[in-house]
């Protein structure tokens, strides 16, 4: 897999009440990923970016909601969510700030 492609797979971490509970209970982390990303690509991207070992990947295609803007009806885009399970003993803290260089 191409390193440039792996950098485009992970779009953003999902920080919500549900994803936080899953992270604490099951050692899983939720990410918003590219619509055309495959499970092996997601696994390789997480291992490369965060230097952790991945046990498995589950994906969900989330349908966009229909929203109204006054009289106009619009629709949000569909997107893909990935739940990444980490190997026992591995930890991924997305809220930590990088250490400042002294």
Swiss-Prot record:
GO terms for molecular function: rRNA binding; structural constituent of ribosome. GO terms for biological process: translation. Gene3D superfamilies: 3.30.70.330. GO terms for cellular component: ribonucleoprotein complex; ribosome. It comes from the Bacteria. It holds the Pfam family Ribosomal_L23. Keywords: Ribonucleoprotein, Ribosomal protein, RNA-binding, rRNA-binding. Part of the 50S ribosomal subunit. Contacts protein L29, and trigger factor when it is bound to the ribosome. NCBIfam families: PRK05738.1-1, PRK05738.1-3, PRK05738.1-5, PRK05738.2-4, PRK05738.3-2. Belongs to the universal ribosomal protein uL23 family. One of the early assembly proteins it binds 23S rRNA. One of the proteins that surrounds the polypeptide exit tunnel on the outside of the ribosome. Forms the main docking site for trigger factor binding to the ribosome. This is Large ribosomal subunit protein uL23. It comes from Chromobacterium violaceum (strain ATCC 12472 / DSM 30191 / JCM 1249 / CCUG 213 / NBRC 12614 / NCIMB 9131 / NCTC 9757 / MK). The gene is rplW.
């Amino acid at each position: 897999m191409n390193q440039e492609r792996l950098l485009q797979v992970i779009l953003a971490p999902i920080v919500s009440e549900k994803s936080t509970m899953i992270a604490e209970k099951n050692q899983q982390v939720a990410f918003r990923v590219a619509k055309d990303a495959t499970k092996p690509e997601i696994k390789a991207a997480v291992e490369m970016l965060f230097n952790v070992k991945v046990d498995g990947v589950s994906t969900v295609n989330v349908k966009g909601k229909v929203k109204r803007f006054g009289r106009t009806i619009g629709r949000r885009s569909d997107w893909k969510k990935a739940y990444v399970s980490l190997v026992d003993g591995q930890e991924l803290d997305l809220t930590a700030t990088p250490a400042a260089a002294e």
